[in-house]
Amino acid sequence: MEVTFFGTSAGLPTKERNTQAIALNLEPYSNSIWLFDVGEGTQHQILHHAIKLGKVTHIFITHMHGDHIFGLPGLLSSRSFQGGEQKPLTLVGPKGIKAYVEMSMNLSESHLNYPITYIEIDDHLTYHHDGFTVEAHLLNHGIPSYGYRVMAPETTGTINVEALKNIGLEPGPKYQEVKSHDTFEHNGQVYQSKDFRGESKQGPVVAIFGDTKPCSNERVISRDADVMVHEATYIDGEKHLANNYHHSHIEDVFALIKEANVKRTLITHLSNRYNTEDINEIYQTLIQNEDTPNFNFVKDFDSFKI
């Protein structure tokens, strides 16, 4: 799996950063791309990358603020002409996302050549697709804002070839049955497949947050995550300024990393008050502290393997 950032600014774009958009490549589990938020200009950002809109099967919106959704109508329209013809799309988001899209399409007389399934979240959501489980939980941002916990499928353990040979089963097509089924039959006897496989491995967990001030659901979403994507609109100064506007301060994120046992954190949604030089200087200062957890300030077009 791989996460790519097409927009990392907060509120407004800058000369260096677009508004919010994240792509999650599900390979090798699925040949699909999921988008999280579609800020203004997202489709233009995607043109500079190998990702194709036709491979986007799901879009998850964290909340209805403009820097997270103003690029959605244009991207949906372009998908009709960029490999998305007749390919269904699932759009998940807060209440109102369906009305927003349909009104935009109707008023602009735009017509899509593929179906959209809308899933509007109330308080929380559990969604299953292609072996993935996605949980959405409400955050604290003044308007409904959600964080998504994406859990990849479990990977089946490696076939124990010697154990299978011991029962007279030589390598061949039957091995695929052992790998993919709970039981298999050989020479008239039924065997439990798990007795001939190594331990299964849980797939990675990715936590992707919408805008929020600290709240209890953050720990539910990020618990033991392999990768967490979190906003830090304020990366210096007083914490109360961030919380007054229902946003997170860098110190809030660091506390969450430690409480939730997060392995790696990618910090986005940086205020446009910070330029690249500011961000680099603040990063160097922060990592001098031995208590600083593992994190990166991300920039547009950064990609990270999961």
Swiss-Prot record:
Its EC number is 3.1.26.11. Its cofactor is Zn(2+). Zn(2+) 1 binds at H63, H65, H141, D211. It is an enzyme of class 3 (hydrolase). Binds 2 Zn(2+) ions. The keyword Hydrolase applies. Zn(2+) 2 binds at D67, H68, D211, H269. InterPro entries: RibonucZ/Hydroxyglut_hydro, RNase_Z/BN, tRNase_Z_dom. It catalyses: Endonucleolytic cleavage of RNA, removing extra 3' nucleotides from tRNA precursor, generating 3' termini of tRNAs. A 3'-hydroxy group is left at the tRNA terminus and a 5'-phosphoryl group is left at the trailer molecule. It holds the Pfam family Lactamase_B_4. GO terms for molecular function: 3'-tRNA processing endoribonuclease activity; zinc ion binding. The active site is at D67. Keywords: Endonuclease, Hydrolase, Metal-binding, Nuclease, tRNA processing, Zinc. Belongs to the RNase Z family. Homodimer. Zinc phosphodiesterase, which displays some tRNA 3'-processing endonuclease activity. Probably involved in tRNA maturation, by removing a 3'-trailer from precursor tRNA. This is Ribonuclease Z. The gene is rnz.
